[in-house]
Amino acid sequence: IKTLGFSDHSPYIFDGDYYSHFRMRPEEFEGYVQSLTALRDEYKKDIDIYIGVEAEYYPKYFARLCDFLSDYPLDYMIMGQHYLCNEYDGTSSCDVYTEEKDLERYVGQVIEGFSTGKFAYIAHPDIFRFQGDEKIYEKHMIRLCEAAKSLEIPLEINFLGIRASRHYPRKDFFRIAAEVGNNVIFGCDAHSPTELDYKKEFDCAMKEY
């Protein structure tokens, strides 16, 4: 490996005393950046290290997040839309949905996030667990894919989903992406160093998607 990017779940500064269960707290972020900056400097002759975050687009708080992150030397931000609305007032994208209104809300929020120009690509764009009518799914995912193509935002085939046998990546989603003509990237989504050996996932992605 000659290039390695780190993109932990970004802190979000919510109103009140709400904290996410799956992301670092704002007060931990400086240590995150400092540790990666030190590693980047120490190993600069051996490997290129990039410092980033994975973040949702939450309309109520996104400007606040960007203002917070602007104080740090980040190289990129990935969109990973794990929740609808603003998280604390929404539902998980991994819940099961059958109603069109929920899928429409997810896609609309993602496209709105695309339009900010802040995201390098979208991780697991097919994370939304819609199990309703396939024609409804296709209609709205065409919207998502066309918006991503227009704004030159790549779509990720997520290796963690393959590795952990999750409900994504979805073949029907990437069939739509192929028809629209999207740029696609592979994301190893490694949560430990051992998961950087992703040949099995790569081979699966090349065969299945």
Task: Indicate where each model-derived feature is located.
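Hydrophobic alpha-helical segments and helix pairs
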Residues: 48-92
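An N-terminally biased module of ancient metal coordination in phosphate/nucleic-acid-related enzymes
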Residues: 1-55, 131-145, 152, 159, ...
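Long, positively charged, glycine-interspersed low-complexity recognition regions
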Residues: 173-209
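Domain-core and long-helix interface of multi-subunit machines
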Residues: 78-180
